[in-house]
Each structure stands twice: as C-alpha cells, then as structure tokens.
A protein has these predicted regions:
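Single conserved hydrophobic/aromatic residue that forms the stacking wall/gate
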Residues: 1-8, 219-225
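Residue-level recognition of short, structured coil/turn motifs
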Residues: 4, 12-14, 93
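Hydrophobic alpha-helix position signal
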Residues: 9-11, 116
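N-terminal signal-anchor transmembrane helix
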Residues: 11-67
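Acidic-residue sensor for enzyme active/binding pockets
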Residues: 37, 82, 219, 223
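Soluble catalytic domains of membrane acyltransferases
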Residues: 42-218
Length: 225
C-alpha cells in the first residue's frame, strides 16, 4: 500500500521530509472539510450554495451552446468538485449531467441522486450514456455532461497512459471519445478554494491542436497536475 507520505514524496522528492509532512497534514485537513461540506450540501438551499460556490466564465458555456450542441466537461477530483453539481442553478435551459458508476448500496445510491437533484444536478449511469445522449439529441435538448478523468480505469486498448505526479498511470478517455463521436465541444472545469467553505468554479475552453487521439485529455491532465 502507498501511504500519504509516499504519495506526497513522488512529485516533490526535492522537498524535505518536514515540508512533505506539512503538505500531507494540510491535505488531510482539507479532505475532512470536503467530506463535511458534502454532508452539509444535503440541507443547503440554493441561496446558500450559490453564496459559497461561484460559477465563473459562464459566457464560455453560452458561446459554445450557440452551436446547438451539448458540451462535455472534463474534471478531476480536486478541491470541492462535489459542489460543481450546482452549476445548473446558474444556467438557463441547460441540464448538468454527471456520468458515474452506480453504487450497489441502494440507500446511498438513492441519497446521492436526491442530493444532486436538490441542486439541479443529475447523475447518469455510464452504462446508459449513449442511449441517453441519442434520446436527448432527438429531442434537441442541450446538456453539459461531466466526466471525471482521474479515476483508475482497467487497462484496455482504449486506455490512455501518461505520467502524472511522476507515476505512469491510466486515465479515462471516455469524455473525449464521446465528444468526438457526437461533435460536442470540450471544456475543462476547475474548482478553487477561496477560503474555508467558499470556492470558485472556473471553466476553460479548449481546441484540438494536433492529430493525437487524446489531445484534449492530455491538455486537461496537464492542467490538473
């Protein structure tokens, strides 16, 4: 097993052990905050979450939607990514849909769905993505589909490998492949902590620059790192 100290040592090996321990301690403190904030979101009102989670660069989204095509949002599990479910509060006539793997515990599955819907966020099983998107296309509905790219996929011929924090790891490329299939625009999302319990959520546009099959996944991974 890789401990927090070992993980911290990988990308910043030049740091002293004391500084690494400080970084590790700060991480766990922030991680605990995120856990508590996730629980808090169950009872937060729209006004409360909008006060604490400000969606920046909305104009990028609206400009891309003028193409009359949905958008793929690539994100990582960084900062308070959970509250990104609230972006639907900011956008008119657009649904925020998070792609996820359903959990086996029916109680927590139902709770997770309920909390997302409370803040105009919706969850879509990764096993139903194509059927849902085809249906939405036929209805001319525009959505923002969120994909977390920093999971640990099973290695297959479609898996994209690259160095991340000095370790060669696999990344999900489903978001980019789906965007290419349906001709959707791709944007990056990044939450930044302003102070304890307060965040900004920034959207960054992207364009395909090369013939590399996972050009934008590479760009997003570099930004996330």
């Amino acid at each position: 097993d890789v401990t927090g100290v070992q993980t911290c040592a990988l990308p910043i090996s030049e740091y002293s052990s004391t500084k690494r321990l400080t970084i590790e301690s700060n991480f766990y403190r922030h991680f605990c905050d995120i856990m508590l904030e996730s629980i808090k979101s169950m009872g937060m009102t729209k006004k409360q979450i909008l006060k604490r989670y400000e969606f920046k660069n909305q104009s990028i989204v609206y400009d891309l939607l003028k193409k009359n095509k949905s958008i793929v949002l690539l994100m990582g599990h960084y900062s308070n990514f959970e509250w990104a479910m609230s972006v639907g509060h900011y956008l008119d006539n657009v649904k925020g849909v998070g792609i996820y793997t359903p959990i086996t515990n029916k109680y927590f599955e139902k709770l997770m769905q309920k909390v997302r819907k409370r803040h105009k966020g919706y969850l879509l099983s990764r096993y139903k993505v194509h059927d849902y998107m085809k249906s939405e296309e036929e209805k001319n509905n525009l959505n923002i589909y969120g994909f977390a790219t920093d999971q640990s996929p099973r290695p297959t011929e479609k898996t994209y490998w690259r160095k991340f924090l000095n370790v060669n790891v696999p990344f999900f490329t489903g978001g980019e492949r789906i965007a290419n299939k349906y001709e959707y625009s791709i944007v990056f999302g990044l939450a930044k902590r302003v102070k304890r319990g307060y965040y900004t959520f920034n959207i960054f546009g992207t364009t395909k620059k090369t013939d590399h099959p996972y050009d934008r996944s590479e760009e997003h991974t570099s930004e996330l790192q």
